[in-house]
From Swiss-Prot:
It is a multi-pass membrane protein. It comes from the Bacteria. One of its GO terms (cellular component) is plasma membrane. Belongs to the binding-protein-dependent transport system permease family. MalFG subfamily. Keywords: Cell membrane, Membrane, Transmembrane, Transmembrane helix, Transport. InterPro entries: ABC_transporter_permease (IPR051393), MetI-like (IPR000515), MetI-like_sf (IPR035906). The chain crosses the membrane at residues 30-50, 96-116, 128-148, 176-196, 234-254, 283-303. GO terms for biological process: transmembrane transport. Residues 88-303 form the ABC transmembrane type-1 domain. It is found in: Cell membrane. This is Probable ABC transporter permease protein MG188. Gene3D superfamilies: MetI-like (1.10.3720.10).
Length: 329
């Protein structure tokens, strides 16, 4: 009897349990989740289905749902638009080129923060590199406008060239794309460095100690321990960069004038959608939105599966190497 009383006396009561351990009615966590759910439904799901409906419809009236008819004519008109083709080219090239540069530069800087600087300075350097992320986007855009100014820009002055980056007057030029690319890589660098450096600091330090005992140099430890350990983080960042790259919106570099961006080679899919909505061409805007969605999904699937394909090829190469070594003995 005494043991039973002692056992039940030591058990925690409901008031002593943590918040996550206490039984809660369904409506309490649902109320916390409800704002995010409503935001997603109102600003993501409903607009997506409206875009789907307008992209395959021949009726240009956004609110007239009674006379809708299925048609692919909108997509035919879309791909015959030269502005859309140029925007598609710029968005795809931006996403393709900015992805490796953003990841590689962020990995190098994060490695320097984690492995070079002392522990007391890690937080300081993380804060320094994260400052651009919290800086006003308008201020950053104005700074880059001065950097790429063709008359007295910093870039042309330093390299003693006269390249017209943002005011070339040609829709087909790649000069504006390079300016947008540099601006985008720098803008995303702060967030990427913070995420990758945090992932590197979470790697088990015992792995490095064991590797040091096995005479593995820091470079080998980086490629054999650090990179495989942060692979989920790299896949996550890759997905974000793909989506962000396809949705590039360089309007701020052209003084918020869509016509200036298009006339000087700074068009993109998202900018094209913005222009069509301003003009009231909801069918073309909906079709372009669907094309952007399909391209983003396909591009993301190809790159994500590429990671697994590379791992599978590495495993097969190691397997063949081991089998070859066994046959020699």
């Amino acid at each position: 009897m005494f043991k039973w009383l002692l056992k039940h006396h030591n058990q925690p009561h409901s008031l002593q349990l943590g918040l996550l351990d206490q039984p809660l009615p369904f409506w309490k966590p649902f109320l916390l989740f409800l704002p995010a759910l409503l935001t997603t439904i109102l600003f993501t799901i409903i607009p997506f289905f409206l875009s789907l409906q307008k992209g395959f419809s021949a009726n240009s009236d956004l609110y007239d749902l009674s006379s809708q008819s299925f048609s692919l004519r909108t997509f035919q008109d879309l791909f015959s638009e030269s502005n859309f083709v140029l925007g598609l080219r710029n968005s795809f090239l931006y996403s393709l080129i900015s992805l490796p540069f953003s990841i590689i530069i962020a990995i190098v800087i994060a490695s320097a923060i984690v492995f070079v600087y002392k522990k007391l300075l890690r937080g300081f350097w993380q804060t320094v590199f994260f400052l651009p992320y919290v800086t006003s986007g308008v201020a950053i855009s104005i700074a880059f406008v001065y950097i790429f100014d063709s008359a007295s820009g910093i870039l042309n002055t330093v390299f003693n060239v006269n390249t017209k980056w943002l005011d070339s007057g040609s829709r087909d030029t790649f000069n504006a794309l390079w300016a947008i690319l540099i601006f985008g890589v720098w803008k995303n660098l702060a967030f990427n460095v913070l995420i990758i450096s945090t992932a590197m600091l979470s790697v088990n330090p015992q792995l490095y100690k064991v590797a040091s005992l096995d005479s593995a140099n820091p470079v080998r430890q980086f490629f054999k321990i650090t990179l495989p350990s942060i692979r989920p983080t790299l896949i996550f960042l890759t997905t974000l960069l793909i989506l962000g790259g396809m949705q590039v919106f360089p309007l701020a570099l052209f003084e918020n004038k869509p016509e200036e961006a298009v006339a000087n080679g700074g068009n993109s899919i998202l900018l094209y959608i913005f222009q069509q909505i301003q003009s009231g061409n909801t069918n073309l805007a909906g079709a372009a939105t669907l094309v952007l969605f399909v391209l983003g999904v396909c591009y993301g699937l190809v790159l994500r599966n590429g990671f697994y394909l590379i791992e599978w090829l590495q495993w097969k190469i190691k397997q063949l190497y081991v089998q070859k070594q066994l046959t020699l003995y």
